[in-house]
Amino acid sequence: GETCGFCLMLSSFGFNYKTKEAASHSHPKCDCRVVPSFGKGSKVKGYDPDGMYDRFNECLDTLGGRNGLWAEWDAMPDAEREAYIKAHGNKAGKAFDKYVNKRMVEEIELRDPKWYASGEHSGIEFTDSAVKGEKLKRWKKDPGERITAEKLNALCYKAEFWEDESHLTAPNSDGKTTISRADLSTGIEIKTIYGAGSENTFKSHIKSIPGKNGVKLTVVDVSENEKVTDEQAIKWISKYIARYHISEVRMLGHDGKLLRIKK
């Protein structure tokens, strides 16, 4: 699977498709090529299931392992969890396993698919030449966003920039309205805070997140900020994600690692 998180997850476990019938399996938004195995010792050039399984576990570790996902499941509002269980045949164990799969697919789809499949990194990418031109022009004046994207890709996240504004028709004097979108095509919103060390700066960045369309994860990068410590940044981020009802932010700290900060 080159584009589908579900198929990338399945590929981590070797040849799952043992029959032609199983190979016909599909799911929403899937455009992946299915390679069935009908015998022992099957091989596909470039396919590294052992390496992919290691990277699967790396993604699982990011989410806190199964224990961390159980904590999420347990913290889910009772009505939401019961509805999830009901949707899976009133079997709590099956429902939790489906929840684990769902969260893993969400995490894998944030990652660089080239890295997930092969261990190699794609680098910064752009959906088209217009986006590339606009970004390169902007980065000449302020390279912070580019630096953060490079660091994210080095940490195995997909760093593909797209048009981060949608222009829709609207019944106003301009005849249109502009809706801001996440910075990256995966739904990652980048907040690079290098030159400021005030609480208000963190507040304004966090406050803007709910107003953007399609944000799946926000990364706050303070790795090169000499005016604020990781500890202080964590306190401010925690304060404002609670205030603005944001479930999670990942902070890129001075040690170059991503830290999950949950509401």
Segments from the language model and where they lie:
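Catalytic micro-motifs at enzyme active sites that drive phosphoryl/nucleotidyl and oxygen chemistry
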Residues: 15-23, 163-168, 174
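Metal-dependent catalytic core segments for phosphate chemistry
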Residues: 181
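Residues in well-ordered beta-strands of folded domains
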Residues: 8, 33-35, 160, 189-191, ...
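Activation/maturation switch segments at domain boundaries
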Residues: 1-114
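Short, surface-exposed basic-aromatic patches at helix termini and helix-loop junctions that form
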Residues: 21-25, 185-186, 238-242
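Metal-dependent nuclease catalytic core centered on acidic motifs
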Residues: 108-167, 193-263
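Conserved catalytic cores of phosphodiester-cleaving nucleases, focusing on short active-site segments
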Residues: 175, 184-192
